[in-house]
Amino acid sequence: MKEIIGIYGTAASHWVGDGFPVRSLLYYGDLREHISPFLLLDNAGPAQFAPTDKRRGVGTHPHRGFETVTIVYAGEVAHADSAGNSGVIGAGDVQWMTAARGILHQEYHSEAFARQGGTLHMAQLWVNLPAKDKMSAPRYQAIVNADIPRITLPDEAGTLRVIAGEYQATHGAAKTYSPVNVWDLQLNADKEVYLQSPATHTTLLVVLQGNV
């Protein structure tokens, strides 16, 4: 059993652009080595949006030296960047963008989602790059839900998706520079689960919905 260093509550909400109402659940400036190599985790939504023809989101902006991992739970997000990558990710999909030596990108609600309206919920995790990899070429991984390994937990406790790293010899879909495990866990009500992680790893448990 690992020592619990701290339990942190929900931060105040703020807007990123005009499309993402965000709560920053983790921030490197406060926790530093306790969450390395992770820098930040934002939880956007769940939020309701009315149908519109207007583009909602964040215009072109730069990133450098780290990776952004966007996990969509509801709605659709469209991405485009200066390396020529573009695409739409929907519920269950993951976008893993490596900014490395530098990239410009933009994120908006997809055109179809904007016109239809509905619930948007996503999380975005920032992962620091090792010093030796910070000047690597930018990279973009669009990972659809069907390509993410899914494990059924014992006693009908729920499911675990292995986005990156591995869990019980099941390897995740994303290619990473740092040895990290990113698991997306859906735990059913009144159930419990015991998860093993490497003794040398810092472990973060982030509750996006519900209570533990």
Indicate where each model-derived feature is located.
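Glycine- and acidic-residue-biased ligand/ion/polar-headgroup-sensing regions
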Residues: 64-84, 90-94, 100-104, 189-191, ...
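Short, Gly/Pro- and small/polar-rich lid/capping loops
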Residues: 1-12
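Short, structured patches in soluble enzyme cores that scaffold and shape functional sites
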Residues: 124-131, 144, 162-166, 186-189, ...
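A short glycine-rich, His/Asp/Glu-containing loop-to-beta-strand
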Residues: 14-73, 151-194
